[in-house]
Amino acid sequence: MLEFVEKLTLYPWLLVRKDVTALQDAGFPDPTILHIVLGCAHFNYLNRMADGIGIRFEYQTEIPEVAQRRSDSGSPGPASLDPTVRESESSGLAWIGFQESNNVVAETDGPLNLYCVMSANPAARDLAREWRSYQLKGTTQLEGRLRAQLGLYISGLNHCEYSAYWLNKILKGLSESDSLCERLASGEPPPGLRSREQSLFTHARRLTYEPASTKEEHIQQLRRSGFNDQGILQLTMLCSYFSFENRVALALGVPIERET
């Protein structure tokens, strides 16, 4: 289990069906595996929130800071970023069993399979659905199109084809170009960004790959780019949410819905 959690935390795109099968063979029932995945993904969300806005201990502590594991480029190396690793397992049923819910089917205009695979934990499923909707609603500091672009970019960095599929649909509905969507889905920021938008995509990449490397100077850069603290909080929540969603989809092998 610890090996599974470590991989889900550090390299979620490398998870394959046999990782889940190993948990099942070790005696973990599917609802427990779901609980493990949700817990790990949730703490990845919380870690990014804490690191992204500089939350520190409220009291004196002797706990040492954890040294950062970095490659020479400051991000995961090419081998760990190979998007073809999961290609052979990109179709079929999710890696754990689940029961489809008529309520979910009736009420969902979005990532149905993501919610169905969470059906063993209805409270978490319903909260995830509401939280996703909240994160994609535009605000003064982060309008809806930009939020979807950032979500697709983060999903591209994590090689999460499932989340990328749905974010791509949102952007296509906003008449976004195919070329830009393809670029974002491959983990590349839009070309020719102004400094304001560039600071957003740079920070999103940092929170995706190395959230603990965030420093106050990075927050100051966002402020200089025109974001107030509420906007920075919104950006941090958005990046943290897609860290959660990507990990749930990747860890459970959630398949893309078949269009009829």
What is the predicted function of each stretch?
Residues 1-260:
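Hydrophobic alpha-helical segments
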